[in-house]
């Protein structure tokens, strides 16, 4: 398994915590989503997707076009339509550090 570095209290807006790693379906599209009702509806309609985001659509489109595998690694700070209690600048640094750990592990086995 992979253990990610913990987010500090400033990044989480609460207690320090170690991020969890999830594998599964992520919904992606070209529209910014900031509506809890829509997020919940999409979650129901698409079988419990783990997240909704925008950037992965471009990754998937390019991978499909060139016939290569694609992978999206996300660090999620909040739920669409919910108020975030995280400090965005602190979260970015912590998320980047965690992503680097994960990508190094992935590259080592590819």
Task: Show the residue positions of the predicted features.
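Glycine-rich phosphate- or other oxyanion-binding loops that anchor nucleotides, phosphorylated ligands
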Residues: 1-110
């Amino acid at each position: 398994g992979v253990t990610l570095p913990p987010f500090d209290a400033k990044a989480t807006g609460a207690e320090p915590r170690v991020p969890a790693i999830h594998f599964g379906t992520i919904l992606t599209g070209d529209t910014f989503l900031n509506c809890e009702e829509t997020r919940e509806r999409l979650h129901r309609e698409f079988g419990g997707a783990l997240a909704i985001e925008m950037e992965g659509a471009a990754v998937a489109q390019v991978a499909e076009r060139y016939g290569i595998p694609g992978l999206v690694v996300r660090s999620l700070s909040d739920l669409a339509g919910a108020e975030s209690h995280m400090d965005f600048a602190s979260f970015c640094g912590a998320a980047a550090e965690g992503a680097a750990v994960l990508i190094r592990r992935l590259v080592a086995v590819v």
